[in-house]
């Protein structure tokens, strides 16, 4: 039964993924495949925003999130040494060894023709809840009192600092949960920090 999943001639070893005989016929094969998850298109997308003003100070924020969505990691994210690549940190910390028998991921294995013999089948091990909550924007500003500006012929001056993508709460490792590209080959959302002035004449 293992050969159908991993290829003819494969010898099961300690640390390989264990498969469930879903149909209960004593054989693990393609008939045991089943649907899992909600897909990688979120069923719920939401935002939370707010603002506060006190005297000359102002504050605003925007949270963005998604729910009821999942992502299946594949490619270089879950395949150690894929295409002569590196070893993702999650494999270093959480792959099976004789000293770490309760690890989340299967054992590390050598690469053959650019594809590792580590089990990379479509299994629940690599399926993650891709729900997330991200602080998309936060800004603090201060408007100078008009009496300070009379001599400069300026009617208004506001100083502000803001940040984008400051932090994200998510269970997905290695990749940006907002990005449905599941192999980690695209850049994540970048943090950005700005300081600025708004002038009125």
What does each model-found stretch correspond to?
Residues 1, 87, 95, 101, ...:
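C-terminal beta-signal and terminal closure region of outer-membrane beta-barrel proteins
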Residues 61, 159-161, 197:
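Membrane-embedded beta-strand positions of outer-membrane beta-barrel proteins
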Residues 1-38, 100:
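Conserved small-residue
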Residues 56-61, 147-148:
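Repeated loop/turn-to-beta-strand initiation elements of outer-membrane beta-barrel proteins
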Residues 53, 64-66, 162-166, 200:
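Outer-membrane beta-barrel pore domains and translocons
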Residues 8-13, 66-158:
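Extracytoplasmic gating/loop element in the C-terminal half of outer-membrane beta-barrel translocons
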Residues 47-49, 137-141, 194-196:
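Membrane-embedded beta-strand positions in outer-membrane beta-barrel channels/transporters
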Residues 44, 55-57, 131, 153-157, ...:
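Outer-envelope beta-barrel architecture signal
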């Amino acid at each position: 039964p293992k050969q159908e999943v991993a290829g003819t001639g494969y010898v099961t070893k300690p640390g390989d993924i264990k498969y469930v005989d879903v149909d209960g016929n004593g054989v693990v094969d393609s008939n045991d495949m089943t649907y899992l998850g909600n897909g990688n298109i979120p069923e719920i997308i939401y935002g939370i925003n707010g603002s506060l003003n006190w005297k000359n100070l102002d504050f605003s924020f925007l949270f963005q999130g998604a729910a009821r969505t999942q992502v299946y990691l594949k490619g270089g994210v879950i395949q150690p040494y894929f295409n002569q690549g590196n070893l993702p940190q999650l494999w270093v910390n959480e792959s099976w060894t004789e000293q770490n028998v309760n690890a989340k991921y299967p054992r590390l294995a050598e690469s053959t023709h650019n594809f590792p013999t580590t089990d990379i089948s479509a299994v629940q091990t690599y399926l993650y809840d891709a729900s997330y909550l991200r602080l998309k924007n936060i800004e603090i500003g201060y408007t100078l009192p008009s009496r300070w500006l009379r001599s400069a012929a300026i009617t208004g001056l506001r100083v502000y600092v803001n940040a984008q993508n400051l932090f994200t709460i998510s269970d997905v490792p290695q990749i940006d949960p907002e990005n449905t590209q599941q192999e980690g080959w695209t850049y994540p959302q970048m943090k950005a920090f700005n300081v600025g002035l708004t002038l009125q004449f």
